[in-house]
């Protein structure tokens, strides 16, 4: 299977990257893990495959000006897209983790969200919701009073839409970001596509993507003085060394004065 994937071409006619092959393998492994959990198969053969390590590209972390322009652009977006992207920036959660969020995962008193599952798109409209791969992936993230107001406002809108259009009550196990008229979560690729449209429409760097919001959250934590272990725990990394390897440049860059300006813009504009 992997050899066939490596022979494929992307939309630009170029060979697919090794990281893409790994993403495909992860999706297949998730399905097989579920089959093993349900005693359909005894072992997950996908976990026995050793893949070569890939060179990690330095991520484009938005500048202060880019963050401000992005916030302005998000203010014009439909509510569910706006909440999704702001939540990604505020918590550092992955696309799949946000897509798999249910209302029962929110603790309003503690202002916390239990990250305990992830949504993976398989093919077409099929989507698979799975548990975190590691213990560190099952975690709690916290949000501000401003984010609480935004989430409560969003929940009221979801209550109204579910009552009027679905003719039922909003359940605690409903997904926060749900396909209208169904109980299925929206797919991560939907938010990827929309984000690209936002970037293009507002003249923002095309190097940015939804995962850049996770990097932004991490950079702001680092700029705010959080240590590596704390950031690793919030992001769901198994080892603090993973966090350090990814954000070593961010640690250096965000020690500079612009980081303070970025935190200020976060405090007033980004919930």
Regions found by a protein language model. Give the residues of each.
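Basic, Lys/Arg- and aromatic-enriched nucleic-acid-binding interface segment
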Residues: 14-18, 22-24, 37, 41-43, ...
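C-terminal catalytic core of tyrosine-transesterase DNA break-rejoin enzymes
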Residues: 37, 86, 90-97, 190, ...
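Catalytic-site neighborhood detector that most strongly recognizes the C-terminal catalytic loop/helix
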Residues: 53, 57, 119-121, 235-261
């Amino acid at each position: 299977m992997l050899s066939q994937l490596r022979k494929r071409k992307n939309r630009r006619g170029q060979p697919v990257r090794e990281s893409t092959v790994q993403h495909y393998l992860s999706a297949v492994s998730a399905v097989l893990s579920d089959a093993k959990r349900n005693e359909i198969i005894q072992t997950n053969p996908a976990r026995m495959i050793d893949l070569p390590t890939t060179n990690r590209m330095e991520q484009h972390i938005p500048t202060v000006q880019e963050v401000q322009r992005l916030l302005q652009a998000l203010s014009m977006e439909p509510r569910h897209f706006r909440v999704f992207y702001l939540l990604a920036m505020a918590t550092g959660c992955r696309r799949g983790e946000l897509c798999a969020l249910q209302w029962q995962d929110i603790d309003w008193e503690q202002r916390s969200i239990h990250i305990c599952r992830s949504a993976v798109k398989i093919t077409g409209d099929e989507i698979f919701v799975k548990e975190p791969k590691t213990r560190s992936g099952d975690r709690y993230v916290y949000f501000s009073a401003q984010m609480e107001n935004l989430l409560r406002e969003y929940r009221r809108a979801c209550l109204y839409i579910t009552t009027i259009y679905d003719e039922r009550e909003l359940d605690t196990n409903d997904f926060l970001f749900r396909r209208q008229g169904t109980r299925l979560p929206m797919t991560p690729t939907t938010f990827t596509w929309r984000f690209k449209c936002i970037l293009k429409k507002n003249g923002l760097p095309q190097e940015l993507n939804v995962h850049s919001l996770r990097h932004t959250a991490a950079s702001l934590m680092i700029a705010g003085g959080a240590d590596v272990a704390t950031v690793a725990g919030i992001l769901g990394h198994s080892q603090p060394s993973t966090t350090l390897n990814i954000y070593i440049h961010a640690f250096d860059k965000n020690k500079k004065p612009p980081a303070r300006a970025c935190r200020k813009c976060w405090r007033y504009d980004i919930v």
